[in-house]
C-alpha cells in the first residue's frame, strides 16, 4: 500500500501528517479509512491515530509517544515524567500531559490521558518522538503540586531515585514560578536529599534567601498527617520525610 511504510515510521500521526505524504486531503482521508478497516491503525481520539503491529494487532507507540502527539506543543509532565525516567515506585495508568492548548481527557489502550494546563515552555526536552520535562523541571513541578506526583510518600521515593541534578537549572527555573513557598519546599528537599542530588550548597542557600517569615504547610496532605515544623525553612513538612531523609539538625 502506497505511503504505508512512511506512516509506519510515524507510529502516531494525524490527518495533517498524512496530507503531507499524499499532497491531497481527500486522498489522505481515504488512506486513513482504508488503514482503519484493515486494522493497520487504531483511532486514539479525534484526528489522532496509532500504527499497529499487523501480526499482534497491538499499538506500536507507547503512552509517551502518544501523549507527545496530542497537541503540537504537548509534553509528558509530573509523575508521568518520573515514570518516563524510570524512577516510579507505583504503577500509574494516568498519563499527565501538559500543553497550552486544552484537550478533553480520554482513555486509550489501558491509559487515561489527563490534561494539565501549563503556561511555561522551559525545561522540556525532545527524545526521539517524546517530549518530556527534564529532571530539574520535573522535580520542581512535582514538589509544587504533590497531588500530581502521587502524594508525599510517592514523591519522596521518586526523588530518592532521580539521581544527580543541575542546581543552576533549578534556580533558573524557580524564577519563573516566583513563589516563596516553592523556594522553601524545593530548598528543603534539596538539603534533605542532597547526597543523591549532588547540588552545590550555594544553590540550597540561595533558596533559603528567597523565603520570608511566613510559615507554609508543604501541602494539604501534610495538614492531615503527622508533621513537623522546620524553622530553617519556615515549613511544616510530613514526618515521613524526616524518617527517611538525611539526618540533619534544623
What are these regions (language model features)?
Residues 1-26, 105-106, 122-125, 129-137, ...:
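An N-terminal domain-start capping segment
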Residues 78-128, 134:
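Exposed, interaction-prone assembly regions rather than primary DNA-binding/catalytic cores
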Residues 35, 81-82, 190:
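Hydrophobic alpha-helix position signal
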Residues 26-28, 90-91, 199:
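Short, surface-exposed acidic
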Residues 37, 83, 87, 145-148:
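Short, intrinsically disordered, mixed-charge
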Residues 1-73, 107, 168-178, 183:
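Short beta-edge/loop segments at beta->alpha junctions of small alpha/beta modules
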Residues 124-250:
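Hydrophobic alpha-helical interaction segments
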Amino acid at each position: 500500500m502506497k505511503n504505508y511504510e512512511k506512516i509506519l515510521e510515524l507510529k502516531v500521526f494525524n490527518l495533517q501528517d498524512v496530507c503531507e505524504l499524499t499532497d491531497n486531503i481527500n486522498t489522505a482521508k481515504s488512506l486513513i479509512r482504508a488503514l482503519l478497516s484493515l486494522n493497520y491503525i487504531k483511532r486514539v481520539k479525534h484526528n489522532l491515530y496509532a500504527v499497529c503491529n499487523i501480526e499482534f494487532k497491538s499499538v506500536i507507540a507507547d503512552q509517551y509517544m502518544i501523549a507527545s502527539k496530542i497537541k503540537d506543543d504537548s509534553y509528558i509532565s509530573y509523575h508521568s515524567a518520573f515514570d518516563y525516567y524510570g524512577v516510579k515506585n507505583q504503577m500509574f495508568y494516568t498519563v499527565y500531559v501538559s500543553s497550552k492548548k486544552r484537550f478533553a481527557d480520554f482513555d486509550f489502550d489501558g491509559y487515561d490521558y489527563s490534561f494539565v494546563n501549563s503556561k511555561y515552555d522551559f525545561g522540556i526536552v525532545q527524545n526521539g518522538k517524546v517530549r518530556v520535562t527534564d529532571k530539574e523541571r520535573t522535580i520542581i513541578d512535582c514538589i509544587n503540586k504533590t497531588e500530581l506526583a502521587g502524594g508525599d510518600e510517592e514523591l519522596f521515593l521518586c526523588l530518592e531515585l532521580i539521581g544527580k541534578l543541575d542546581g543552576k537549572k533549578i534556580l533558573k527555573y524557580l524564577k519563573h514560578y516566583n513563589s516563596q513557598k516553592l523556594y522553601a519546599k524545593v530548598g528543603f528537599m534539596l538539603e534533605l536529599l542532597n547526597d543523591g542530588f549532588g547540588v552545590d550548597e550555594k544553590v540550597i542557600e540561595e533558596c533559603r534567601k528567597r523565603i520570608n517569615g511566613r510559615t507554609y504547610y508543604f501541602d494539604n496532605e501534610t495538614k492531615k498527617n503527622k508533621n513537623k515544623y522546620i524553622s530553617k525553612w519556615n515549613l511544616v513538612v510530613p514526618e515521613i520525610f524526616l524518617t527517611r531523609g538525611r539526618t540533619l539538625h534544623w
